[in-house]
């Protein structure tokens, strides 16, 4: 599983350590001793259910600091906002980097290039909640969503991908483009209308990975080189079933490992027992 560049991906975390959150956090730490990940991609909903009120909110301790306390998890964490963060103070999530040295969130959407042993990997982090109408139009529940400039983010995404020359490009955001779910279909159609054409435009995106649905899904659409991945919850999973394009799905909770070398990109879905239950392989 270890590559030139190795990353963790975890999302839909915040259960105050309950359910499987703490055991999975311990597993991530133990596996980290062998894999030596560069960082954790924290793809939204770090805090259920109403986000955080401030950088001093006790949820930072009960959902994050005291749970992900293994020495091997004292890494850079690169987060994105999920819909549950948008129920609270989203600026506090960005500002938490002034409190915790491992919280690396320079903006609501941003990009990071990893360069190691001659391999380059670009991760593009999206803020997907403001790209979806049902959040934009519900300011009572998601007060910060309507304040964001959708066009500016989409233009930034287009420009970022247009200029991306790395060996591999992965785009992550909280919401899926394709997935089995009983959540509103409009979430996916908005993502398909607004984000998908940009992802496909420059033919350099290998994987779009998300959370939100609380199960593992790997979807591949005919005529599309991008692999669409739903990463499960790292605390509490939900049932799943196959849909059009499903390569694999599982209702296990857990996390994922991304491994990159010059010619190969792999993503491993890990259950709470530490078993690899599915592997996505990309080659050049």
Where are the predicted features?
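N-terminal active-site segment of His-dependent metallophosphoesterases
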Residues: 1-58, 180
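Residue-level marker for buried hydrophobic side chains located in beta-strands
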Residues: 7-9, 40-42, 79, 171, ...
């Amino acid at each position: 599983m270890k590559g030139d560049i190795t990353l963790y991906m975890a999302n839909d975390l915040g259960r105050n350590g309950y359910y499987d959150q703490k055991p999975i956090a311990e597993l991530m730490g133990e596996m980290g001793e062998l894999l030596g990940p560069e960082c954790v991609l924290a793809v939204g909903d770090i805090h259920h259910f109403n986000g955080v009120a401030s950088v001093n909110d006790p949820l930072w301790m009960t959902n994050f600091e005291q749970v992900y306390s293994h020495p091997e998890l004292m890494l850079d964490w690169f987060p994105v906002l999920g819909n549950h963060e948008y129920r609270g103070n989203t600026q506090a999530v960005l500002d938490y980097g002034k409190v915790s040295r491992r919280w690396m969130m320079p903006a609501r959407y941003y990009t990071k290039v990893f360069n190691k042993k001659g391999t380059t990997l670009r991760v593009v982090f999206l803020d997907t909640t403001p790209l979806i109408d049902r959040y934009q139009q519900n300011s009572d529940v998601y007060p910060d969503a309507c304040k964001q400039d959708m066009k500016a983010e989409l233009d930034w995404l287009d420009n970022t991908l247009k200029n991306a020359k790395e060996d591999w490009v992965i785009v992550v955001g909280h919401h899926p483009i394709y997935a089995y779910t009983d959540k509103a279909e409009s979430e996916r159609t908005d993502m398909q209308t607004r984000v998908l054409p940009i992802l496909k435009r420059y033919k350099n995106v290998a994987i779009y990975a998300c959370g939100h649905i609380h199960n593992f899904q790997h979807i591949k659409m005919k005529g599309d080189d991008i692999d669409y991945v739903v990463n499960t919850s790292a605390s509490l999973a939900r049932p799943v079933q196959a849909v059009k394009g499903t390569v694999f799905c599982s209702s296990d909770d857990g996390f994922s490992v991304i491994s990159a070398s010059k010619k190969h990109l792999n993503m491993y879905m890990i259950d709470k027992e530490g078993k690899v239950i599915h592997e996505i392989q990309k080659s050049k």
